[in-house]
A protein has these predicted regions:
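Flavin-dependent oxidoreductase catalytic core characteristic
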Residues: 1-152
C-alpha cells in the first residue's frame, strides 16, 4: 500500500511539517528581534554600546562585598535579573566589537544572544506580573504564582 490520505500517516506528516514551519518561524523571529536591536544600537537609536562598555568597566573595578537587603518580595530575583541584563549587554558588546556590522551574518551568535534576551523578558515579566497581582489580591492568593516566579 502506498501513501493514502485516509491513513493516520497523512495527519502525522502534516503535523510534522506544520511543526517544522512553526519552529522555522520562531528561529526567524529570534534573529529579527536581536538584529533590529543591534541595528538600532549601531544607528544610535538605542544606547547599547555605551551600556555594554559601562558593564565591562564595572567588571574591572573592585567588587562590593556589601550584603544586599533581601527583605522584600523578589529582591534576590531582581539581583539575578540585573546580572542577566549585564551578561546580555556584555555579549552584545563583545559581539559587536568582534564582528562589527558583520554580526548579522553570525546567526549562531545572534541566536544565543537572542535566547538570553527572551529569557530575561520572560523572567522579568513573570516577576512584574506576580508583584502586581501580589499587591492587588494579597499574599495568600498569590502563593503559587510567587513560587513559580521564584523558581523560574
Amino acid at each position: 500500500m502506498g501513501y493514502s490520505k485516509e491513513t493516520p500517516m497523512e495527519s502525522a506528516w502534516r503535523d510534522a511539517r506544520i511543526a517544522r514551519i512553526y519552529e522555522g518561524t520562531n528561529e526567524i523571529n529570534r534573529l529579527v528581534a536581536i538584529g533590529m536591536l543591534i541595528k538600532k544600537a549601531i544607528k544610535g537609536h538605542v544606547d547599547l554600546i555605551s551600556e555594554a562598555e559601562n558593564v565591562a568597566n564595572s567588571l574591572t573595578g573592585i567588587p562590593s562585598f556589601e550584603l544586599p537587603d533581601l527583605s522584600d518580595l523578589f529582591d534576590e530575583e531582581k539581583i539575578i535579573l540585573k546580572n542577566l541584563k549585564k551578561i546580555f549587554l556584555m555579549l552584545c558588546g563583545a559581539g559587536m566589537k568582534k564582528f562589527g556590522l558583520d554580526i548579522e551574518k553570525e546567526q549562531e551568535v545572534l541566536l544565543s544572544i537572542s535566547d538570553i534576551m527572551i529569557e530575561i523578558y520572560l523572567a522579568e515579566s513573570a516577576i512584574l506580573r506576580t508583584e502586581k497581582n501580589f499587591k492587588k489580591f494579597g499574599k495568600n492568593s498569590q502563593e503559587g504564582q510567587v513560587s513559580m516566579s521564584q523558581l523560574y
